[in-house]
Amino acid sequence: PPPQQYIALYEYDAMQPDELTFKENDVINLIKKVDADWWQGELVRTKQIGMLPSNYVQQI
């Protein structure tokens, strides 16, 4: 199945090496919901994979 895609509602600057930095309106493919607050995703624009705060994105 195609990946679930999310759009970034806000800009986020990574605070840890395993986190994604992204801009508002970036598209992110969901890889895994690690827990309620942190998900793993792939930033479509750069193909970078990392953790992101779930409250910064909304499903497309």
PLM features: residue spans?
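Src homology 3 (SH3)-mediated interaction modules
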Residues: 1-60
